[in-house]
C-alpha cells in the first residue's frame, strides 16, 4: 500500500472536481480525501495499491474532469493507514 499526494492546478474549484475525484477513487477502492486549497488548487490524498493510485493519477490528468486541469504534481510515500473512506473536504 502506498500514499499519493497530488496537487491539482487549474480551474478546479466550484465545478464538481472534488465530487468527481471522490467518485473515481471509490470506484478504485481507494481511501483518502480531496480538499480545496486557498490558492485555488485541489489537494488529493489517496492510499491504496500503487496500480490503483496510478490509475487515479491518469484520470486526474485525462482532460475528462470537471473544470480544467493545467498541471498535477504528485508525491509518493508509504501508506500511513490513518484514512477511511474517501471524502470531500
UniProtKB/Swiss-Prot annotation:
Membrane spanning residue stretches: none
UniProt keyword Ribonucleoprotein present: no
Phosphoprotein listed as a keyword = no
Name the catalytic site residues: 18, 36
Name recorded for this polypeptide: Acylphosphatase
Q: What is its EC number?
A: 3.6.1.7
Q: Kindly give the PROSITE patterns that the UniProt entry links to this protein.
A: ACYLPHOSPHATASE_1, ACYLPHOSPHATASE_2, ACYLPHOSPHATASE_3
Q: What enzyme category does the UniProt record give? A: hydrolase
Name the UniProt key words of this record, in alphabetical order: Hydrolase
Amino acid at each position: 500500500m502506498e500514499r499519493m499526494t497530488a496537487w491539482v492546478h487549474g480551474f478546479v474549484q466550484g465545478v464538481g472536481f472534488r465530487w468527481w475525484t471522490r467518485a473515481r477513487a471509490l470506484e478504485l477502492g481507494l481511501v483518502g480525501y480531496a480538499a480545496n486549497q486557498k490558492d485555488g488548487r485541489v489537494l488529493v490524498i489517496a492510499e491504496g495499491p500503487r496500480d490503483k493510485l496510478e490509475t487515479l493519477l491518469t484520470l486526474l490528468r485525462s482532460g475528462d474532469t470537471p473544470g480544467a486541469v493545467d498541471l498535477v504534481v504528485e508525491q509518493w510515500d508509504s501508506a500511513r493507514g490513518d484514512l477511511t473512506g474517501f471524502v470531500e473536504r
